[in-house]
């Protein structure tokens, strides 16, 4: 069970951090 929980936690973090980095790179390119 802890493995599944950490797996979903990793997916949640990845789905949150990845778009944030993508938006950050886009803003840097716009500047």
Curated annotation (Swiss-Prot):
Location within or outside the cell: Plastid, Chloroplast thylakoid membrane
This protein's GO CC annotations: chloroplast thylakoid membrane; cytochrome b6f complex
Sequence intervals crossing the membrane: 4-26
InterPro entries with a match to the protein in the record: Cyt_b6/f_cplx_su6 (IPR007802)
Keyword DNA-binding: no
Record protein name field: Cytochrome b6-f complex subunit 6
Gene: petL
Family: Belongs to the PetL family.
Membrane topology: Single-pass membrane protein
Domain of life: Eukaryota
GO terms (BP aspect): photosynthesis
One Pfam entry name: PetL
A GO term, aspect molecular function: electron transporter, transferring electrons within cytochrome b6/f complex of photosystem II activity
Function (record text): Component of the cytochrome b6-f complex, which mediates electron transfer between photosystem II (PSII) and photosystem I (PSI), cyclic electron flow around PSI, and state transitions. PetL is important for photoautotrophic growth as well as for electron transfer efficiency and stability of the cytochrome b6-f complex.
Assembly description: The 4 large subunits of the cytochrome b6-f complex are cytochrome b6, subunit IV (17 kDa polypeptide, PetD), cytochrome f and the Rieske protein, while the 4 small subunits are PetG, PetL, PetM and PetN. The complex functions as a dimer.
Keywords on record: Chloroplast, Electron transport, Membrane, Photosynthesis, Plastid, Thylakoid, Transmembrane, Transmembrane helix, Transport
